[in-house]
């Protein structure tokens, strides 16, 4: 298989939306975006597709992602970002715009929002000075083709070129394929968070954080 890594484009929005939703779920059935959006899967995907295209630039904007084309087909994606200048707080205004475009109300989104506190008990904290790798996923038909290894290499190089000397990535405890991929890319265990409220909500004990030098 021929794999090419490239910058994401606006026409990749559907792939990026799927990547975000699946990466958020990891190997479980529910993830952070299910909670935030609190809608059926098709509506979650619509929301995330719009979010990747919603200006101004933010953490989940399409420009932050890299895509792996396998034999000419978009097969996998991930993103890397600066948590200080382009972190989670940058998503708030674009999300509000998408909520308005989709006609969602606070009542529509309330069920998942009520569970966010339980999720955040294990949400990894940013490591000082680290480039953050996030939203990593491969279409099922292209798994084991080496796309993630090449994407990780490329996104780490992107962080390195932006002046970062360290990178971090987090994953759900029990996601063995993710653990193996990150170890192969040079990441090492830093810490983990476990909480019974998180496990009751998600189905796994918590989250692990890996780091590596760049």
Show where each model-derived region lies:
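C-terminal "cap" of GNAT-fold acetyltransferases
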Residues: 165-168, 172-176, 185, 195-214
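Conserved acyl-donor/pantetheine-binding loop and adjacent beta-alpha core of acyl/acetyltransferases
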Residues: 84-130
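Conserved acetyl-CoA-binding loop-helix of GNAT-fold acetyltransferases
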Residues: 144-157, 184
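A short beta-loop-alpha structural element at the N-terminal edge
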Residues: 4-18, 25-31, 82-83
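Conserved beta-strand in the GNAT
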Residues: 67, 73-82, 132, 137
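Conserved GNAT acetyl-CoA-binding A-motif
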Residues: 131, 159-170
């Amino acid at each position: 298989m021929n794999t090419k890594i490239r910058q994401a484009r606006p026409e990749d929005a559907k792939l990026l939306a799927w990547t975000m939703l699946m990466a958020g779920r990891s190997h479980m059935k529910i993830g952070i975006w299910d909670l935030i959006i609190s809608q059926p899967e098709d509506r979650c995907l619509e929301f995330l597709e719009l979010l990747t295209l919603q200006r101004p630039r933010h953490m989940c904007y399409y420009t932050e992602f890299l895509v792996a084309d396998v034999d000419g087909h978009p097969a996998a994606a991930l993103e890397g970002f600066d948590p200080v200048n382009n972190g989670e707080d940058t998503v708030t205004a674009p999300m509000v715009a998408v909520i308005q475009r989709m006609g969602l109300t606070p009542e529509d989104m309330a069920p998942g929002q009520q569970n966010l506190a339980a999720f955040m008990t294990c949400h990894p904290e940013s490591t000082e000075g680290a480039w953050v790798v996030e939203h990593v996923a491969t279409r099922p038909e292209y798994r084991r083709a080496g796309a993630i290894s090449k994407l990780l290499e490329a996104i780490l190089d992107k962080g390195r070129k932006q002046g970062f000397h360290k990178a971090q990535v987090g994953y759900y405890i029990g996601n063995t394929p993710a653990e193996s991929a990150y170890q192969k890319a040079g990441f090492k265990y830093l810490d983990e968070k476990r909480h019974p409220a998180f496990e009751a909500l998600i189905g796994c004990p918590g989250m692990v954080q890996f780091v590596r030098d760049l």
